[in-house]
């Protein structure tokens, strides 16, 4: 077998052990190098699977009781502009997207790739959005909670219990609050991905409305280019006027 053919063969996730045994006898350096690379990839995949299954430890306790579990997370607490977005996701027990993890650990491209897969494989997905005006009226913490409530109530299937990332959702459901829950629960991690991609899409839309603020790059966070635009043009209608330094600029001309 030619080395290029062996290279293509070793791209598979699972290979007949008999074939691997035969390749191990091949003394060509190129073949042995490919085998080493394959083994490393397999070890990495095994570790990824182990960690993925470990992030279902909370869900498994409830699944064993026949309960549906909803993971809840939010994104957008810290930005100076735009809404806070929450998502609630109910995953099936056979969910197997190994790359699902805390959205902050994933590249934008990976989040975008996982987003439609989560929507397709989840039992139910709900999204909640609280805009900057609500945030200014009731504060970011309470707006967070309302967005989470809206997300849970938007689920087409009612969960029996919620796993929430360090918050309490104002709904009549049993809840388990997990510190850094998006790194401990796949349900919360899936919700974090949905919320992040959904909010980023909204901020891309706002970037077209207010091109001077580069919302498609900074997502409303206080980056250097964002702060420079604020000083030059003043706040837009989507800025959080109670957030510093926007609050100090309220007297400036607002962008139309």
From Swiss-Prot:
Gene3D superfamilies: Ribonuclease H-like superfamily/Ribonuclease H (3.30.420.10). The keyword Chaperone does not apply. GO terms for biological process: DNA replication, removal of RNA primer; mismatch repair. Keywords: Cytoplasm, Endonuclease, Hydrolase, Manganese, Metal-binding, Nuclease. One of its GO terms (molecular function) is RNA binding. One of its GO terms (cellular component) is cytoplasm. It catalyses: Endonucleolytic cleavage to 5'-phosphomonoester. The keyword Endoplasmic reticulum does not apply. InterPro entries: RNase_HII, RNase_HII/HIII, RNase_HII/HIII_dom, RNaseH-like_sf, RNaseH_sf. Its EC number is 3.1.26.4. Its cofactor is Mn(2+); Mg(2+). It is found in: Cytoplasm. It comes from the Bacteria. Pfam families: RNase_HII. A divalent metal cation binds at residues 73-74, 165. Residues 67-255 form the RNase H type-2 domain. Manganese or magnesium. Binds 1 divalent metal ion per monomer in the absence of substrate. May bind a second metal ion after substrate binding. Endonuclease that specifically degrades the RNA of RNA-DNA hybrids. PANTHER family: RIBONUCLEASE H2 SUBUNIT A (PTHR10954), RIBONUCLEASE HII (PTHR10954:SF18). Belongs to the RNase HII family. This is Ribonuclease HII.
